[in-house]
Design a protein with these regions (language model features):
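A conserved segment at the C-terminal end of the G1
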Residues: 16-28
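Small-molecule kinase domains that catalyze NTP-dependent phosphoryl transfer to phosphate-bearing small molecules
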Residues: 137-178
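Conserved phosphate-donor/acceptor-positioning beta-strand/loop module used by diverse small-molecule
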Residues: 91, 111-131
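Switch I (effector-binding) loop of TRAFAC-class P-loop GTPase G-domains
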Residues: 25-44
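Conserved nucleotide-sensing/catalytic segment adjacent to the nucleotide-binding pocket
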Residues: 39-94, 98-99
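The conserved Walker
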Residues: 10
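Hydrophobic anchor at the beta1->P-loop junction of P-loop NTPases
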Residues: 6
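Conserved glycine(s) of the Walker
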Residues: 13
């Protein structure tokens, strides 16, 4: 049983990947109340996906304005209620934080799950172009995105040294179908 964090900078394809998983399966949307806040999640009987997914640009747990503790409490509630084989979520903000990944690793251990990180990467130019295509805003901050990309890679490697399983996938060099198949293998394996 696994908890999977899908992380990466803006424009690497996190939301595209999760929306692809949701649309290719038999997922049903649910709400769960955690600490007085209603949180969206999706479930197909085996895999639980936490986060908001609609036609917005900002999806996942970033769209739900989750705090670290709020996300961890939601993961625990979904596990307690349904015992899914896999719980996954995608984010930008928490994907750059080693402290958050460490807290998730410890939480996974406590609830009897394995913690996996699926870090999506692409060149800075590719990521910025995708963001500009999506938002129409040509003012992508290359320095900020470069810093986030480094943080995603470095924190992912570091948490791997602590016992998490870490996988890097280049979404620029691999097709959407190949990336989706890699996620399916990870959720089923």
């Amino acid at each position: 049983m696994k908890i999977i964090q899908i992380c990466g900078t803006n424009g690497v394809g996190k939301t595209t990947l999760v929306k692809g998983l949701l649309s290719s399966g038999n997922f049903t949307k649910f709400n769960i109340e955690v600490d007085g806040v209603s949180r969206e999640w999706w479930y197909d009987g085996s895999t639980a996906v936490i986060g908001k997914y609609n036609d917005r640009n900002c999806c996942g747990v970033d769209a739900g304005n989750y705090s670290v503790d709020g996300l961890i409490d939601t993961i625990k509630a979904v596990i307690c209620q349904n015992k899914p084989d896999c719980v996954l979520f995608e984010d930008v903000r928490m994907g750059t934080s080693y402290a958050f990944k460490d807290k998730l690793l410890r939480t996974a251990y406590v609830v009897g799950y394995e913690f996996n990180v699926l870090a999506l990467i692409a060149s800075l130019e590719c990521s910025c172009n995708r963001v500009m295509e999506r938002t129409g805003n040509p003012g992508a901050n290359f320095d900020a995105m470069r810093g986030k990309a480094r943080a995603v890679i470095n924190t992912s490697k570091r948490i791997g040294e602590q016992g998490a399983k870490v996988f890097f996938i280049d979404t620029e060099k691999n097709s959407k179908a190949a990336v989706l198949n890699a996620l399916r293998r990870l959720t089923n394996g």
